[in-house]
Amino acid sequence: MECLANYQQMVDPTMVWRSIKSNDAVRMDVSFTWKKEEWLIPAVFPIPGGLAVDVARKLPYYHLKNCLTIYEKRRNAGFHSPLERLMIDQYDPFHFHPMGHLLTENDCIDEWRSERFIWNPLRMSPATPKEYYPARKLVEHYGFDLNTGWVIFRLYFKGDFLSVRD
């Protein structure tokens, strides 16, 4: 994560977000382990008035299969109270929402907003079919293994000193 404070490369800020181009990103290739899981920061993007950071959580196939099997079994068991639904969600490997903070030399910037892309090679719930194509496109764009589950969070940070200027 230390590379984020050293963001110096100038990139065209007029990019279109829905069409991801390889020359729009500053490749980071930073990885770290948190809570015994592998996480990656594949790229950083400039946005008007700020910066966007992609953070990817890797879900190995065996872990994904075990969690989703338990999740499906409990979900299909019949009526569930709100408390039981919350208990079931603990087995959903995609049910995770980090809150991003960008540390700079003088400040800590909280995430402005975020998007989540879920890649589930098993195509079992809870990922919906409408999420499938954009997530696959993003996983292929970064060269991630399609046989592994991925949750990619795109975290947006706003700040005047993060702006890309000519």
Where are these regions (language model features)?
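Alpha-helical, hydrophobic structural elements that either
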Residues: 1-166
